[in-house]
Amino acid sequence: MQRIVLVASELAIITGHNKYEKIQKAIDSVLNRSKIVKKYIPKSKVEEKLLALSENEIVVIKKELNLEGNASLKQVENMIKQQVMTKSLNENISENESRVKADEVLKAMPTLNKCLEKSLKQDLQMRRGNIKEDKNLDKTQQKRNITIDSRNAQMYEKELYVDPDKQFNVILRGKIDGMNDEYVVETKNRTKRLFNMIPDYEKVQLNAYMFMTGKEKALHIECYNEDQNSVEYDFDKLFWDDCLSKIMSFVNEHIVGHIK
């Protein structure tokens, strides 16, 4: 029986709640991860964008980075991280200071700025969120007088669906930021402001984590610089059932036809 493996962090793309990512990215990732069709999946937004640029744009970007003409795309990506991102990743500076530091470097590289600014800042946001995650969880522990452990400690996995003809089953996988006896805990690092609400695309992930762990409650934490907001969120069966319906539509429309 063919295992179709989905990860919790991509479900909102699959269900259509995340409008910012292209569905093709999720299709390729699922096909590759499930070993149905071999695909190359870029490991960062910068790499993804570099692969889509023209040869002329790459040549100019190499010059702006003072790289040799025969430098590989990996070397270009590494130099971008080194020159543009490193100073902006300091967890002790504010989100605005982080952006300003990146902008200062990009000013001197007009082609790189034009082609890669959005991708670079998406990667920067992701990396800063990872770097600040433990600190943000510690702050919540102190503020709410609770313990948050099991931090990214385990890969959870649970079966979502089994095909009646036993051709395939659908598996959901994911790592959780933290957990205690009562909650699964998810933390988000905001770059411009607190939302003071949970967007639907993040509710998909929260319900997925509760489904995998059997917990009935989640604690959603959002952080912006030193400000923090936490909201308790109960498992929403109606919302999750709707997500499951959309997930299976995705699987049947985009994945099952590739199974040999």
Regions found by a protein language model. Give the residues of each.
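Nucleic-acid nuclease catalytic cores
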Residues: M126, R144-I259
